[in-house]
C-alpha cells in the first residue's frame, strides 16, 4: 500500500481570509469637534418678582383723585375787564365751587387751559389782554403783553408750576387768578372756555 500525502500551499486559506476581510467594512471613526467658548456662559432669564417695581408707590384706595372740569365765561364784550379766581371763589362754575370742592379737604389745580373763542366779525378791531396772578394778590391788570385778538380763536396753557399747583391747598383757600381787559368795542367779542385738571384728596 502506498500512502499519498497532500500538502496545502496555504493559498486557499489566504483567499478565504481576503474574502472575509472584503466583506467586513472598516469601522468609520467620526471626529469629535469641541468648540471653545471665549465668553462667559449665558444665564437664563430671571423672572420678575411679583409686585410693584422699586421706586414706584402703589396706589391705594385712599389716594388722591383726578378730575377734569370744563366751563365757559360767555358774552365777553370787546371792552370788558375783570378776573377769574380759581378755588372756592370760582363763581363762574358753581359745580366746582359748591360741589366737588366742598367734598374734599384739599385740592390742587395742576393744569389750566384758557381758550378765547372768537364771536366777533372779521372787521372788528381790538384785543383782550390777560395776566396770570399765581398768588391771588392783584386786583387789576398790570400788563398787556399777553393778549388774544378778538377776531381769532386762541389758547394758552398754564402748567402746575406757573399756577401754584405743586402744593396742596385747603379747600377754603383760592389757588390762583387770571385777570383780563379788552380794548375793543362794547359789542360781544367772544367767550372764554376754561379746562382745569384738578387733584383732590382727603374726602370729608
From Swiss-Prot:
Biased amino acid composition, Low complexity: 27-41
Gene3D superfamilies: 2.60.120.20
Note from the entry: The N-terminal region like those of many plant virus capsid proteins is highly basic. It has been suggested that these regions may be involved in protein-RNA interaction.
Top-level taxon in the UniProt lineage: Viruses
Organism this protein belongs to: Cereal yellow dwarf virus (isolate RPV)
Chief place of localization: virion
Record-given protein name: Major capsid protein
TM region(s), chain numbering: none
Lineage: Viruses, Riboviria, Orthornavirae, Pisuviricota, Pisoniviricetes
